[in-house]
UniProtKB/Swiss-Prot annotation:
InterPro entries found in the cross-reference section: G3P_acylTferase_PlsY (IPR003811)
Species per Swiss-Prot/TrEMBL record: Neorickettsia sennetsu (strain ATCC VR-367 / Miyayama) (Ehrlichia sennetsu)
Protein name: Glycerol-3-phosphate acyltransferase
Top-level taxon in the UniProt lineage: Bacteria
Assembly, per entry: Probably interacts with PlsX.
Entry keyword annotation includes Translocase: no
Pathway(s): Lipid metabolism; phospholipid metabolism
């Protein structure tokens, strides 16, 4: 029989999924009469919000998507192990990508992954943000910057974290790469 502690952790995981699955980009754009899913790339994330509605809206969506992972990971770090906190981070990324509120569709997962890095491994967050900035200046393609930043973040996480703490981060990174395959395909076809 499961202990009360294990049941509480399971309840917390479910709670994190329910909260992290909220598609903030879609909700905010709808408040202003815009269906973000039919504009720009059709994605609900910060990049498309910036493209369609401007930097202010994109920044708000980025922060909300960032916090949907950072806040529960912070709580998990305070009360449980880093392994559990990392698992909570993966659940937040997964919920963002496969939102129950959007028939299991969603964003690409980069903003919540940055939230995980910020709380769990701050040096990785700093390196990932700097990497994103450098490659955005070089290529002017947010998806290229995001993929390289997440890849570098995963490699650096592997160097800093214990294996069981790293594995959920690796799983989240793989998920982000899978969600960006259409971007890569379109980019290569345009060349």
């Amino acid at each position: 029989m499961a202990s009360a502690f294990e049941m509480n952790r399971l309840a917390f995981i479910i709670f994190v999924y329910v909260i992290a699955a909220i598609p903030f980009g879609r909700c905010i754009s709808a408040c202003f009469g815009v269906d973000i899913c039919t504009r720009g790339s059709g994605n609900i994330g910060a990049t498309n919000m910036t493209r369609v509605m401007g930097l202010g809206f994109g920044s708000v969506v980025f922060m909300l998507d960032f916090l949907k992972a950072a806040a529960p990971v912070f709580l998990a770090v305070q009360c449980c192990s880093d392994v559990f906190a990392s698992t909570v981070g993966f659940v937040a990324v997964f919920a963002h990508v496969f939102s129950v509120y959007m028939a299991f569709k969603g964003g690409k997962g980069v903003a919540p992954m940055m939230g995980v890095y910020f709380v769990l491994v701050l040096p990785v967050f700093i390196v990932a943000v700097c990497t994103w900035g450098i490659f955005f200046v070089l290529f002017r393609q947010p998806f290229i910057s995001s993929l390289i930043a997440c890849f570098i973040g995963a490699v650096y996480s592997y160097a800093l974290l214990e294996l069981y703490v790293f594995l959920p981060i690796l799983a989240g990174t793989v998920l982000i790469f899978i969600r960006h395959t259409s971007n890569v395909r379109e980019f290569l076809q345009a060349r």
